[in-house]
Amino acid sequence: RVDAVVVAGPSGVGKGTIIRKLMELFPQQFGFGCSHTTRGRREGEQEGVHYHFTSLDAMREAVARGEFIEHAEVHGNLYGTSVAAVGDVTKRGQVCLLDIDIQGVKTVKASPLRPKYVFIAPPSMEVLENRLRDRGTESEESLSTRLHNAREEVDYGTTE
């Protein structure tokens, strides 16, 4: 039995869309392991649905207490998946779907969790750039950072 599936890939590639579709089509089989983040909430995002939004200090303290399966700094913010988030889903008899970037994947691989991994690559870097621009949430500097990181993530995701 698989307890978790890690859906990984660059920001803007569609991980969340795939996860939502799986949960819509197979609501008894899959549940979402809602991650924590220190970044600000985007328009339309809801606490406990998209992320658990928290402060930097609170997240660092929880990490120090060993409450996270994985955590990483991504684009200047902390993100992480708590042991409790995965446990809440698996206790219901569902496979926990996790939306994790490549840094988080590396941490999960070193943890006791033994998920299956699915890597989602963009059709092209140009398409990815257009998706990120269309969101309207990125500054030019942030967009540049995300695209640089995406190239490295695609290299890792297609070779590891």
How should each PLM-predicted stretch be described?
Residues 24-32:
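Post-Walker A helix-loop "phosphate-sensing" segment adjacent to the P-loop in P-loop NTPases
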Residues 13:
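ATP-binding Walker
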Residues 35-96, 103:
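ATP-dependent small-molecule kinase phosphotransfer cores
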Residues 8-10:
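P-loop (Walker A) phosphate-binding loop of NTP-binding proteins
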Residues 96-101, 111-134:
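Conserved phosphate-donor/acceptor-positioning beta-strand/loop module used by diverse small-molecule
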Residues 105, 137-160:
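Small-molecule kinase domains that catalyze NTP-dependent phosphoryl transfer to phosphate-bearing small molecules
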Residues 1-5:
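Pre-Walker A (Motif I) flank of P-loop NTPase domains
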Residues 16:
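Walker A/P-loop
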